[in-house]
């Protein structure tokens, strides 16, 4: 549970009381602070015991590139840290980007710039404070059924071959001939407590009809469409009214090596799609960049944005797919049919039938 109100960025006294009472309030003292702030310097104990010392160097290395940020002008600095998901956002994206991790589970991290209207808070999503931009937020969606569900479909309907799977996806039309398929081999998080497979005829978009199955060759496209449409519909729900939609999609995880899936993401979300150039250590690099930000601002009188700091750094992502407008329009038209089908699945789960 977060002890902080993510909108005001202040501790919530009622939650502190339940968690640890006045003793906890006394320990945490001041309100949370924004990343990029220097809180002080390391205690002399760390110098005596572990060799922390005046001067030194901060560096970040990844494969063939090494950036040296220069000597420190004071003792080792103490700066706010963050978690692995916000750190990945720092390492890979800019405000207005979306990171989609397609691994064993599926996770979306959506950077939301500051707005006079806050994003919607849903029970199916998480809202985090952005570590480097005051007033900015990160929306997070987490799904249990990710690559393992796709692999099950591959094994059953594509001869356990990704090449065959991709071929079947590319041979079938966007919209899958007015059919939607949902695959939840494990109890899902979004929508909650749903398990099983569900197939719908959506030729009448307002009245989906439950089907027993669909043609074998339709399943590879069906699972991609339902998984990504679930995310697409929720982005539309979360963003504040009048907010600009994200403009870049950055895909990570094992499926980021599959060009067919990368193109699929570009088409469903209507965004240029990128993959990371820094491998699997994005969270660690993001944490180091946050520390660098505190040091950099200190050298600049406390001024400057994170984007200004990294403006001369090597690119962290590369373009791999661009949306096809005619395909994107198909998926825009599937948002409401998707919602109708998911509503029926939720009703099915709530009645236990």
Positions of PLM-derived features:
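Active-site core segments that coordinate phosphate-bearing ligands/cofactors
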Residues: 3-22, 38, 43-252, 257-353
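Acidic catalytic cores of enzymes that act on phosphate-bearing nucleotides/polynucleotides
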Residues: 26-33, 92
């Amino acid at each position: 549970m977060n002890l902080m109100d993510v909108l005001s960025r202040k501790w919530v006294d009622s939650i502190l009381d339940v968690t640890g009472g006045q003793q906890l309030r006394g320990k945490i003292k001041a309100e949370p602070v924004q990343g990029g702030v220097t809180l002080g310097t390391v205690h002399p104990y760390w110098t005596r015991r572990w060799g922390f010392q005046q001067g030194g160097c901060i560096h970040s290395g990844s494969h063939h590139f090494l950036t040296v940020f220069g000597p420190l002008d004071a003792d080792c600095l103490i700066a706010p840290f963050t978690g692995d998901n916000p750190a990945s956002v720092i390492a890979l994206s800019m405000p207005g980007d979306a990171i989609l991790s397609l691994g064993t589970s599926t996770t979306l991290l959506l950077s939301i710039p500051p707005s006079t209207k806050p994003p919607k808070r849903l029970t199916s999503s998480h809202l985090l404070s952005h570590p480097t931009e005051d007033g900015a937020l990160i929306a997070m969606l987490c799904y249990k059924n990710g690559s393992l569900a796709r692999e099950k479909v591959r094994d059953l309907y594509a001869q356990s071959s990704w090449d065959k799977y991709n071929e079947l996806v590319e041979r079938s039309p966007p919209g899958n001939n007015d059919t939607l398929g949902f695959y939840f081999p494990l109890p899902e998080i979004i929508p909650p407590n749903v398990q099983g497979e569900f197939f719908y005829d959506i030729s009448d978009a307002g009245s989906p009809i439950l089907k027993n199955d669909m043609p074998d060759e339709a399943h590879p496209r069906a699972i991609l469409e339902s998984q990504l449409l679930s995310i697409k519909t929720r982005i539309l729900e979360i963003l504040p009214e009048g907010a600009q939609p994200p403009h870049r999609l950055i895909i990570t995880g094992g499926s980021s090596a599959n060009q067919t899936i990368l193109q699929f993401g570009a088409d469903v979300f209507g965004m240029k799609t990128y993959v990371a150039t820094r491998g699997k250590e994005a969270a660690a690099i993001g944490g180091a960049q946050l520390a660098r930000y505190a040091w950099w601002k200190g050298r600049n009188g406390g001024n400057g944005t994170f984007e200004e700091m990294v403006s001369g750094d090597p690119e962290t992502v590369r373009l791999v797919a661009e949306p096809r407008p005619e395909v994107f329009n198909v998926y825009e038209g599937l948002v409401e049919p998707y919602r109708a089908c998911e509503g029926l699945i939720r009703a099915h789960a709530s009645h236990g039938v």
